[in-house]
């Protein structure tokens, strides 16, 4: 949610500039937006992509076209390497969405993404970092946060796309 993102930015000591989701689908509009940031002194865009795909290639192309350097710290890292980074940097992420509760048990909603969850996903042969959208998580704390996000859990919601538990800040 916007409130979560704003609170994450606050705890990082950074500003956040929300961009409507549809902007990414409009190449011209997105590149124009990136150029505006370039003109304000931005040099880099950090992307969280792990695997090469259409979206990651678009991100790279758009950044380079706008004169910005894409930084992809997770690019082509193994799932185990990513788990090790989560542990090393004390990242606390809460599982907030499960695409198919027949595949990943709903009991994991609201739990931390940790080695126990990682090993369970490996055991049931689901991508351990959810790269195909099997689950989503929300970061609520990390070693670079000023303090942990203060949140409560909302009511579990069942949709055609999966099951989710909102975090309320």
Which residues make up each language-model segment?
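ATP-dependent adenylation/nucleotidyltransferase module used to activate substrates
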Residues: 1-95
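Short, surface-exposed, polar/charged, turn-prone segments marking secondary-structure boundaries
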Residues: 11-13, 72-75, 98-101, 121-125, ...
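Extended interaction regions within the primary functional domain
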Residues: 32-33, 37, 142-143, 168
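Generic structural hydrophobic/aromatic packing signal, biased to beta-strands
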Residues: 70, 93, 138-140, 165
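A generic structural signal for short, non-catalytic loop/turn and secondary-structure boundary residues
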Residues: 88, 133, 158-160
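A conserved mid-domain beta-alpha-beta active-site/ligand-binding segment of alpha/beta enzyme cores
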Residues: 96-154
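C-terminal accessory domains and tails appended to enzymatic cores
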Residues: 151-169
């Amino acid at each position: 949610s916007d409130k979560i993102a704003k609170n994450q930015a606050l705890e990082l000591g950074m500003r956040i500039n929300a961009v409507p989701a549809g902007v990414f689908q409009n190449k011209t509009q997105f590149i124009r937006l990136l150029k505006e940031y370039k003109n304000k002194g931005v040099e880099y865009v950090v992307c969280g992509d792990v695997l090469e795909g259409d979206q990651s290639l678009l991100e790279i192309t758009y950044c380079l076209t706008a004169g910005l350097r894409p930084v992809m710290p997770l690019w082509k890292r193994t799932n185990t390497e990513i788990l090790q980074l989560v542990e090393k940097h004390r990242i606390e992420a809460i599982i907030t969405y499960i695409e198919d509760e027949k595949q990943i048990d709903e009991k994991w909603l609201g739990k931390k993404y940790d080695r126990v969850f990682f090993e369970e996903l490996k055991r049931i042969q689901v991508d351990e970092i959810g790269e195909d959208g099997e689950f989503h998580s929300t970061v609520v704390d990390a070693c670079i946060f000023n303090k942990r996000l203060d949140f409560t859990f909302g009511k579990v919601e069942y949709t055609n796309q999966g099951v989710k538990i909102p975090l309320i800040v």
